[in-house]
Amino acid sequence: MPDIRPHYFIGVPIPEGIANPIYQAAKNEPILTFQKWVHPLDYHITLIFLGAADETQIKKLEGSLAEIASEIDPFSIKFGKIDVFGDRRKPRVLHLEPKKNKTLDRLREHTKQAVLQAGFQVEKRPYHPHMTLARKWTGEDGFPAHVPFESGEVSMMAERFSLFQIHLNQSPKYEEIFKFQLS
């Protein structure tokens, strides 16, 4: 029987003023032929995917996340290259990568420890921070070696991270349930 509990993740939301221009530039680039484009209000950098959870588990995690937020100052995130996950001939995911960022890595590690202590499982795959832009390549040729789309010097201040609930049949589909202001 499928688990009907809501699904959640923890992530850093991308401000609308950053998300909208990225969305327009990527979606209007003719060589980026993907079937499903992520709504710009859903742009985020995932820290941890939690999966199905009940209210008790979420409440248990909330206090730990608030404590983490009080220990980390707001920080700048600079975005680098656009890239894909999956076979380059038919990639699954188009994403924008943030440049290496020690504070983002620290936030992820602290969040991971809190999630484990709250009894959640954490994916064993290596962590690759990214902002998903689109899914399901539809091009006839593979993903190009050079993409003229440039994020330029796109940067943002990460002033909070959030616990998101996923609503699969809505658009936008991610709802910020709890916001944790960095201090």
Swiss-Prot record:
Pfam family, any one: 2_5_RNA_ligase2
GO molecular function per UniProt: 2',3'-cyclic-nucleotide 3'-phosphodiesterase activity; protein kinase A regulatory subunit binding; RNA 2',3'-cyclic 3'-phosphodiesterase activity
Iron found in the keyword field: no
Segments carrying motif HXTX 1: 44-47
GO CC annotation: cytosol
Catalytic reactions of this protein: a 3'-end 2',3'-cyclophospho-ribonucleotide-RNA + H2O = a 3'-end 2'-phospho-ribonucleotide-RNA + H(+)
Active site (catalytic residues): 44 (proton donor), 130 (proton acceptor)
Keywords per UniProt: Hydrolase
Motif (HXTX 2): 130-133
EC numbers on record: 3.1.4.58
Enzyme class, broadest EC rank: hydrolase
HAMAP family, alphabetized: RNA_CPDase
Family as reported in the entry's similarity comment: Belongs to the 2H phosphoesterase superfamily. ThpR family.
Function according to Swiss-Prot or TrEMBL: Hydrolyzes RNA 2',3'-cyclic phosphodiester to an RNA 2'-phosphomonoester.
Name under which the protein is recorded: RNA 2',3'-cyclic phosphodiesterase
